[in-house]
């Protein structure tokens, strides 16, 4: 099935609406559409042909957006690359690319190049790499249909305002950040793009210019609240995802007048799967034997579907009678201690409610007697104190005895990815 290029449609329907705003540039849809055509001509002049991959090793901002839409206009496949990766990591992501863009596109153009004004929904648009929190990062080929259905599902779940201003401070090589650019183009609304996450800058943006949506991981929300975010005037929702969300954090946000929506998603499902509990209208959920979350629907990348048609997420969860999903953790993270299964997220949620704790991560370590012992790695709030005995007692009043950590480690910070997601595999045994 063919659909009109969403950027071309946005430029036709709302030429003067702001497509992108960054610290260095403001582009209307007419301007971004023209820039995408020039970028496509320049890519063609470099020898890039439809169906070939183009690595985008560019900072977040106008140059990235122009190159991204230039790839789509030419019919090439964009491959965003995180600039913070080591050279060897970048090489893995770019080895199959016909071109690597590490500077804004300039130079010769090929005005005779055939341009794509319509998209085949089954064609691959962008290859996004997973964050690699539990294993090596994997490439996921997302189609135009994946992006379109993801945008439609999100709009139904959140509502859509023509004056939407969606703030992105996530890396554009991450599906959560990239989806803001893609959805904004599909909706013909505004993407407000920050090059990196600076808590004070985001607070000022939310307090001043009035973004209506912002996407964050839990660590980012903590830092925004620490930086003084209170009652942002235009914010409809802070979408919080990318890892388990402690109820205490959502309560803290509510007390500060910050509306939050807990989300669950993954790269293979083109970002969002659930928003505020229920699945997107176009997405089906199932809990397999053992508790693994299975996902199906048009947002799931074709290459991520198992022979049974489902995406096996590797995440643990439960569905209530109304179809609301609660994510418990990762299948691989489950701790088996004394023959009992313990989900780290359950223990983390209890510890996160302790007033002295800023962040906590729980994992299992080999133990001759128990098989695995539960270890809690704790970051205390500034000027706060707590002892292992105190925290064990706190857990003992709220959890079954076998779920109480046997070891508490106090550290200045937790190991995380560039996007702020916990690297559980890097926790010390």
Segment roles from a protein language model:
Residues 148-165, 173-213, 227:
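Conserved AMP-binding/adenylation subdomain of ANL enzymes
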Residues 3, 8, 18-47, 52-55, ...:
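Conserved AMP-binding/adenylate-forming core of the ANL superfamily
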Residues 16, 112-129, 136, 145, ...:
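Conserved pre-ATP/AMP-binding loop-to-beta segment of ANL
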Residues 28-30, 125-152:
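Conserved AMP-binding A3 loop
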Residues 55-57, 64, 68, 72-100, ...:
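Short beta-strand->loop structural element characteristic of the AMP-binding/adenylate-forming
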Residues 297, 316-403, 413, 420-422, ...:
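AMP-binding/adenylate-forming catalytic core of the ANL superfamily
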């Amino acid at each position: 099935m063919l659909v009109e290029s969403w950027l071309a449609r946005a430029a036709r329907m709302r030429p003067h609406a702001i497509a992108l705003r960054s610290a260095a540039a403001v582009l209307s849809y007419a301007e971004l559409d023209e820039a995408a055509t020039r970028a496509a001509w320049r890519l063609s002049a470099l020898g890039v042909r439809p169906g070939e991959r183009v690595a985008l090793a560019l900072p977040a901002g106008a140059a990235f957006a122009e190159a991204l839409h230039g790839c789509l206009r030419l019919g090439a496949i964009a491959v965003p690359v995180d600039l913070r990766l080591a050279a060897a990591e970048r090489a893995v992501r770019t080895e199959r690319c016909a071109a690597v863009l590490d500077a804004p596109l300039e130079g010769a153009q090929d005005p005779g190049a055939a341009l794509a004004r319509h998209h085949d929904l089954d064609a691959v648009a962008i290859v996004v790499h997973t964050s690699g929190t539990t294993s090596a990062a994997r490439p996921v080929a997302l189609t135009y249909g994946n992006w379109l259905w993801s945008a439609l599902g999100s709009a139904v779940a959140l509502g859509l305002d023509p004056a939407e201003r969606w703030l992105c401070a996530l890396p554009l090589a991450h599906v959560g950040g990239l989806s803001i650019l893609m959805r904004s183009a599909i909706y013909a609304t505004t993407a407000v793009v920050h090059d990196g996450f600076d808590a004070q800058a985001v607070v000022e943006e939310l307090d001043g210019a009035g973004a209506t949506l912002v996407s964050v991981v839990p660590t980012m929300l903590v830092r925004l609240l620490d930086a003084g975010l209170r009652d942002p005037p235009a914010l409809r929702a802070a979408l919080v995802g990318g890892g388990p969300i402690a109820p205490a954090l959502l309560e803290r946000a509510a007390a500060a007048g910050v509306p939050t929506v807990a989300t669950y998603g993954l790269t293979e499902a083109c970002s969002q799967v659930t928003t505020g509990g229920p699945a997107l209208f176009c997405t089906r959920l199932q809990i397999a034997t053992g508790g693994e979350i299975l996902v199906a629907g048009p947002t799931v990348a074709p290459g991520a579907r198992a022979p049974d048609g489902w995406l096996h997420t590797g995440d643990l969860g439960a569905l209530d009678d109304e179809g609301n999903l609660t994510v418990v953790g990762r299948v691989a993270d489950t701790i088996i201690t004394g023959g009992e299964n313990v989900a780290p997220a359950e223990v983390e949620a209890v510890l996160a409610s302790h007033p002295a704790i800023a962040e906590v991560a729980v994992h299992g370590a080999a133990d001759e007697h128990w098989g695995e012992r539960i270890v809690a790695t704790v970051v205390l709030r500034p000027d706060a104190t707590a002892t292992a005995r105190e925290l064990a007692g706190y857990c003992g009043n709220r959890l079954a005895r076998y779920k109480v950590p046997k070891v508490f480690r106090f550290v200045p910070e937790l190991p995380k990815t560039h996007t702020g997601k916990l690297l559980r595999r890097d926790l010390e045994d």
